Amino acid sequence: MTVAEVLADARDRMGKAVEAVKEDFGSVRTGRANPALFQKVMVEYYGSPTPLGQLASMNNPEARTLIVTPYDKTALKEIEKALVNVPNLSATVGNDGEMVRLTLPELTEDRRKEFVKIVRGKAEEGRVSVRNIRRRSKDELDALKGEVGDDEVARGEKELESLTKTHTDQVDDALKRKETELLEV
């Protein structure tokens, strides 16, 4: 493996770690109904658990309302049951025979602060993941010292530090955006 390959691999894995953090942030509820919150809710469909995103289209006509329209109307009851059982949601779920209407309650200040703590924890997990990738990549670079010149390894380590800073900054930026979104009333 060359220094360039180690750096390319690190860049790719760090990028995936940042994307995973952003995806995790999407699963934390803000004051508005976001279809991304419910994409991975599992619905019992013909005996097997299926993600809601594969069974229905979702849109939000109002900030705190989500309309779930199943592609197959026979799945309506199962979708409603799955949405009622989503933990920590406390939403009103209604079925009118054609679609499921989900109305989210207004978030309290305490609940918002609780969600901010959760998001900060997810961000820290992302930063730790990026640092672990850096450590593994640095070990790979150290193993190359006998094969390539010390100068090239030193340049690689410098580039690796730059990559790490860039990706941890991306996690921090995503955290700031999510905190702002959460604390917005």
UniProtKB/Swiss-Prot annotation:
Gene: frr
Keyword hit for Protein biosynthesis: yes
Protein keywords: Cytoplasm, Protein biosynthesis
Gene3D superfamilies linked: 3.30.1360.40, Ribosome-recycling factor
Protein name, per record: Ribosome-recycling factor
HAMAP family: RRF (MF_00040)
Protein family per UniProt: Belongs to the RRF family.
PANTHER family: MITOCHONDRIAL RIBOSOME RECYCLING FACTOR PSEUDO 1, RIBOSOME RECYCLING FACTOR
